[in-house]
Amino acid sequence: MLSLATLDLLLSISESELIEEMVVGLLASPQLAIFFEKFPRIKRALMKDIPGWKQNLQQRIREAKVPAGLANEFALYQQSQLEDSPLFYAHLPQIVVQLQQWHSPFATQAKTLLHTADLERNPQTGDSFQTLFLQRWRVSLTLQTITIHHQLLEQEREQLLAELQQRLALSGALEPILATNDGAAGRLWDMSQGHLQRGDYQLLLQYGDFLQQQPELQQLAEQLGRSRSAKAQPTPDARFEPYTVMVRQPDTVPEEVSGIHQSNDILRLLPTELVMLGMSELEFEFYRRLLERRLLTYRLQGDNWQEKTLQRPISLKSHDEQPRGPFIVCVDTSGSMGGFSEQCAKAFCLALLRIALEDNRRCYIMLFATEIIHYELSSASGIEQAIRFLSQHFRGGTDLAACLSSTLSKMEERDWYDADAVIISDFIAQRLPEELIRKIKIQQQAHQHRFHAVAMSAYGKPGIMRIFDHIWRFDTGLKSRLIRRWKR
């Protein structure tokens, strides 16, 4: 069957102009104009999608098929073009009858032209009438094809407008919460492609309002997200110079008792050794041990400061900003994290998502209790993932070791090699295995991974929290909440 794109080519119809006209008309619609005036960032993000729209419309036209009646009429038109004048005039009455049977829009005009020519009384010998007839026929075919284009593009326009209105409503509602610059607005626009209704993302708006009511929590998230500072790097041809530092080293300086050992130091003898001198039968044993340096004496030890010479570069010409990697956020969903702590933990993750969108970073959420649940909030379906995450309830146990093990495994993946781990918990948990602590230290020292702790309680175990590079404290207890409210 004849395709619409082929018919455009044969009739020299520019489909790109028709598509451009449709897109301009769509963007000029009153609904979009009002929205663009209110949210200019979303408008700039939407404009980047226009080339994709045009490609999709062109593909839709290529796939469209011409109706059978129009295809047959065009085939008859092509056949008539190839006929010489005598043969064309002989077939003309049949052509008019055929057009009438197909209910062609050109049938009435063709019949009028046939009666005007009156071929029976005035036989035509030239090709002027044939040229006029074919020109009028071609115009009719072009109009029919353009009409099909308009019908097809109008359907696509209505569908696209409905989709845009839904995405614009979602993006407009979430823009104050998640989009702080053009880059974040663009990523938010890309994430709004899912089929979400207003009731679906209402939970995001609620936690956005809660975050506004907790400025200290919002400030804490900003500090954590921006905490990676610039690092000075020596240039490859930098010259080095010696410099001297004082280094503390353990020495035998008599500062404090550090234990007992065998020696011949009479001044530091244990009382039990001195007893042998008062007994004649053990006196020779005492002298024997003295010569062999085997008398039990106190060991005194202290610190001795010595000079040490090191090398350092004379000039540091570059200060390379350390790249801000993605977030791997582990959220404790145990029963002790319920209530206000749960609200704060979810709002804190929402604040980290906003920072990730602003800095073009990825944000991965892991919920740990008796099992581990994963969400990637910065993916194409990030809004749907965020809604599912915010809908979770914290009623499980605490398995911090399993969560940290999963975090280490995630960091070994290529896309998460430079990630920062953020653990949100009250840290009322069991002691971590020594092997796990050793692996975390390797990641911190060898790969410069950073592990942050966001402590939601003042009663977290110090032994657990000692492994983290930085501890951000936000006590959710009633006393701390009242103090924060009083200071505002």
Curated annotation (Swiss-Prot):
Entries under Gene3D superfamilies matching the protein:
von Willebrand factor, type A domain
**Pfam family of this protein, just one?**
VWA_CoxE
Keywords for this protein:
Chaperone, Cytoplasm
Kinase among the record's keywords?
A: no
Is-annotated flag, keyword Cytoplasm? Answer: yes
InterPro entries hit by this protein = Uncharacterised_CoxE, Uncharacterised_ViaA, VWF_A, vWFA_dom_sf
Stated family: Belongs to the ViaA family.
The record's section on NCBIfam families has: PRK10997.1
Q: What does this protein do?
A: Component of the RavA-ViaA chaperone complex, which may act on the membrane to optimize the function of some of the respiratory chains. ViaA stimulates the ATPase activity of RavA.
Its name, as the record gives it, is Regulatory protein ViaA
Give the species this sequence originates from: Yersinia enterocolitica serotype O:8 / biotype 1B (strain NCTC 13174 / 8081)
Traced from the root, the source organism's taxonomic lineage reads: Bacteria, Pseudomonadati, Pseudomonadota, Gammaproteobacteria, Enterobacterales
